[in-house]
């Protein structure tokens, strides 16, 4: 009976260690996992276009980070606060205004729908960055040609 309990407890420990993180996959070394995606902040300032190009070269499906929930916003804000050690005020995210037939609309660079927004008061145009003044939680617009650190995101391959 004691052996049965010991084996059962061992299996429970293994199960709990493999579940509960929301990340039953491996991200490459130096990348952080959250809700089925891998994330990494980069300190080297780039323009928005150059940062997006860099992210697409990191992994299949890679782009500047799209933020789809308040939980993800908190995770990315914490990741940036802990890893971006530069004086820049903004950190690029994958949101950008696009002009289509006389109309402007914002879209994520990875093509996902905008279902969560967290613009700083009065902001919603040009390229978007996480603002240092809001602990990297709110989005501000800034010139797309400005050079800022950035965060890449990609879905890991099975």
UniProtKB/Swiss-Prot annotation:
Keywords (A to Z) from UniProt: Disulfide bond, Hemostasis impairing toxin, Secreted, Signal, Toxin
Q: In which tissues is it expressed?
A: Expressed by the venom gland.
Q: Which domain of life is it from?
A: Eukaryota
Report the SUPFAM superfamilies cross-referenced here. C-type lectin-like
GO cellular component, alphabetical, reads: extracellular region
Localisation: Secreted
Family to which this protein belongs: Belongs to the snaclec family.
Can you say what this protein is called? Snaclec stejaggregin-A subunit alpha
Question: What organism does this protein naturally occur in?
Answer: Trimeresurus stejnegeri (Chinese green tree viper)
